[in-house]
UniProtKB/Swiss-Prot annotation:
Gene3D superfamilies: Aspartate Aminotransferase, domain 1, Type I PLP-dependent aspartate aminotransferase-like (Major domain). It catalyses: L-histidinol phosphate + 2-oxoglutarate = 3-(imidazol-4-yl)-2-oxopropyl phosphate + L-glutamate. SUPFAM superfamilies: PLP-dependent transferases (SSF53383). Belongs to the class-II pyridoxal-phosphate-dependent aminotransferase family. Histidinol-phosphate aminotransferase subfamily. It is an enzyme of class 2 (transferase). CDD domains: AAT_like (cd00609). PROSITE patterns: AA_TRANSFER_CLASS_2 (PS00599). Disulfide bonds: none annotated. NCBIfam families: hisC. It comes from Bacteroides fragilis (strain ATCC 25285 / DSM 2151 / CCUG 4856 / JCM 11019 / LMG 10263 / NCTC 9343 / Onslow / VPI 2553 / EN-2). This is Histidinol-phosphate aminotransferase. It comes from the Bacteria. The gene is hisC.
Length: 345
């Protein structure tokens, strides 16, 4: 791979980051804080949070088996996605490559940052060829985006192809594992040390059941994490979010129980969908959702809205004509969905 300095925008490499009051003093011995222009009333919410989220990263490192220095935390994974564009891509000059279809925020962030976004269509089985992806890259390609399990298709990408991309590409590979907890395929986290150009994204929004607190994770080399920390906003993860995340990590057994239940419910829904006469195909999924091709996605979607049930109409997405994306809910929610669909005319 290219050196980190070669990949980083020159102005970012030279940047002297903002230093907050809590960056300059983070000790625990003091009892009077008169350095940050905070209001002394309304404890504990009057104080700025730890800008480096040290306590949270320490707890997270115990679960993920990754050292805190290799962890970046942001306001949702979308913050990390935006930051890698801002850190590594020269607006109007550089480009990135991604599979298609996939998570839409990669392209949104590319467009916002004036970075060319090159799509490589997945095969009919929703897999990709590393060679096809690499063939689209050139000397101005800074990043390749992969999502596994992929959204909206739900399938794991072939591990051998992912590894080939990481090994053969000279830039950064962003591997989004937002749904990996629901897959039987192991995360790439245990192999992070082997691949200095790999950035792994995960989230508290899915398996952890914490979409409301907006907390995303990026795992990478210490150098890459240092670049992201240099350009992030000073207090990007609020104290309430940090506290809630620590509480969830302390009861990780509960998350594991939820994941097991949701995987069972996914199977229940998939089997029920196969029996519906207007369902043409249910695609295999390793996420907490699945994709189903139906006879008329728009009509069925509108019918369900009328029944007070909301799924996602993916009809306009590449390779997903007449497809609905269905998130796995509780047994009661899933049964209500199936009951409504059985009455659909």
């Amino acid at each position: 791979m290219k050196t980190l300095q070669e990949l980083t925008r020159p102005n970012i490499w030279r940047l002297k980051p903002y230093s907050s009051a809590r960056d300059e003093y983070s000790g625990a011995a003091a009892s009077v804080f008169l350095d940050a222009n905070e209001n002394p009333y309304n404890l504990p919410h009057n104080r700025y949070p730890d800008p480096m989220q040290r306590d949270l990263k320490l707890e997270l490192s115990k679960i993920k088996k990754v050292a805190p220095a290799h962890i970046f935390l942001g306001n949702g994974s979308d913050e990390a996605i935006d930051l890698v564009f801002r850190a590594f891509c020269e607006p109007g000059r550089d480009n990135v490559v991604a599979i298609d279809p996939t998570y839409g925020m990669y392209q949104v962030c590319a467009d916002v940052n004036d970075v060319e976004y090159r799509k490589v269509l997945l095969h009919d089985d929703f897999q990709f060829s590393a060679d096809e992806l690499l063939a689209v890259a050139d000397e101005r390609t800074k990043m390749i985006f992969l999502c596994s399990p992929n959204n909206p298709t739900g399938n794991d990408l072939l591990r051998s192809e992912i590894i080939k991309v990481i090994n053969d590409f000279e830039g950064l590979v962003i591997l989004d594992e937002a749904y990996n907890d629901f897959s039987d395929e192991p995360s790439f986290l245990s192999e992070l040390g082997k691949y200095p150009n790999l950035i792994i994204l995960q989230t508290f929004s899915k398996a952890f059941g914490c979409a409301a607190i907006r907390l995303g994770m990026a795992f990478a080399s210490e150098g890459i994490i240092g670049v992201l920390n240099k350009i992030k906003y000073p207090y990007n993860v609020n104290q309430l979010t940090q506290q809630q995340a620590i509480e969830m990590l302390h009861k990780y057994y509960e998350i594991e129980r939820w994941v097991k239940t949701l995987k069972e419910e996914r199977g229940y829904l998939e089997e029920a969908f196969v029996e519906l006469p207007w369902v043409l195909q249910v695609f295999p999924s390793n996420a907490n959702f699945f994709l189903a091709r139906v006879t008329d996605a728009v009509k069925i979607y509108n019918y369900l809205v009328g029944e007070g049930i909301i799924v996602r109409n993916r009809n306009s997405i590449s390779l997903c004509g007449n497809c609905l994306r269905v998130t796995v809910g509780t047994r009661a929610e899933n049964a209500k969905l199936i009951g409504a669909l059985k009455k659909y005319q």
